[in-house]
Curated annotation (Swiss-Prot):
Keywords, ordered alphabetically: Acetylation, Cytoplasm, DNA-binding, Metal-binding, Nucleus, Phosphoprotein, Transcription, Transcription regulation, Ubl conjugation, Zinc
An individual GO BP term: activin receptor signaling pathway
Protein name as it appears in the record: Mothers against decapentaplegic homolog 2
SMART domains assigned: DWA, DWB
Biased composition (Polar residues): 207-217, 233-243
Species this chain originates from: Bos taurus
PTM sites of type Phosphoserine: 240, 245, 250, 255, 458, 460, 464-465, 467
Amino acid sequence: MSSILPFTPPVVKRLLGWKKSAGGSGGAGGGEQNGQEEKWCEKAVKSLVKKLKKTGRLDELEKAITTQNCNTKCVTIPSTCSEIWGLSTPNTIDQWDTTGLYSFSEQTRSLDGRLQVSHRKGLPHVIYCRLWRWPDLHSHHELKAIENCEYAFNLKKDEVCVNPYHYQRVETPVLPPVLVPRHTEILTELPPLDDYTHSIPENTNFPAGIEPQSNYIPETPPPGYISEDGETSDQQLNQSMDTGSPAELSPTTLSPVNHSLDLQPVTYSEPAFWCSIAYYELNQRVGETFHASQPSLTVDGFTDPSNSERFCLGLLSNVNRNATVEMTRRHIGRGVRLYYIGGEVFAECLSDSAIFVQSPNCNQRYGWHPATVCKIPPGCNLKIFNNQGFAALLAQSVNQGFEAVYQLTRMCTIRMSFVKGWGAEYRRQTVTSTPCWIELHLNGPLQWLDKVLTQMGSPSVRCSSMS
């Protein structure tokens, strides 16, 4: 490898030799971009080597990388080490690497806990896991520490382990098939959905039991366990609300099925685009639908061209746009980052203004009214959908009949407004009264529902305007 910088120490060259390349890309095409990436990687490794030389942990890092052994020791750096790099703070969105964004609460720390190397920031363990193990890594949500890691990121210690072999990739749990009675009737009329569009939804603030991004966001648990956003907080929520949770349901322990029926397994399959996003201003749809293929994407207010990981609203035009909408659009800023990791969907507020989310799946988990709107403050993160919880509800609903399954269609739609909220506590009482909002359709669950409904056939009792 040719020297990119004036001098590259031998240990840096050795460590860079173990760098994983993304999809084996290289050669012609994108040469300038690849060159910039190589230069950035070299700077990131140099910065780490310089720090580890002071603590004597450099040999352990090299041992872990060359042997690819998880039984090596922790390789730690200060968890608030932004000051180490001594580089300027980026001024524009193009200079930021928001992947794995992480912010400490202003009350607890003044530094944001991320490393900054040549105008790009990221969580230290994410940076080096991406460098030496998984080039396609998007977020810390995709990682969980091994059991014997004493300084894992989630432990929130003063030192954080950056040994890439002390972390594992979170696997997406396999959802069990739903057993549906074989049906031959052709569906000719769908029952009406419960419609909360024109009712005034309740409001709630960011759940007290869910810690903001300044604290540990739990790792996605192994298959078979439906996670919540904090063990103690869930207990408090369940005690105070005294309501059932999808986490308590299991497709294998629901009410018994009549096995004399001819049951057909209907399996879940992952679509090419996990969600579709439509943007609205007041009650008017603006622009084309965005189809999300990547597990991490941002919806922001900037004017850069959209790509597979970014839906930019700034370029969208609307001849009917009024002054309120214009002002709101200016405050969207960095917007929201959406993650689809391990069968769970997270929404993280990157904007300086709050976002407001209406997620029936999330509301059901906490025992709230299905139409409740939750305010997510800047720097905070909320799980807004859980595939395993949805699978349990679907299996239960099949036993309750066609209409119960069809009602789950609403759970697959999530509405989210920027800057301005709506509901009983706000001047705007419907989402179509908010200046700027988006609607997410979760394609995997929707397609699963469609297959189940097709298998079930038509409802036993026709629903009409007279019923």
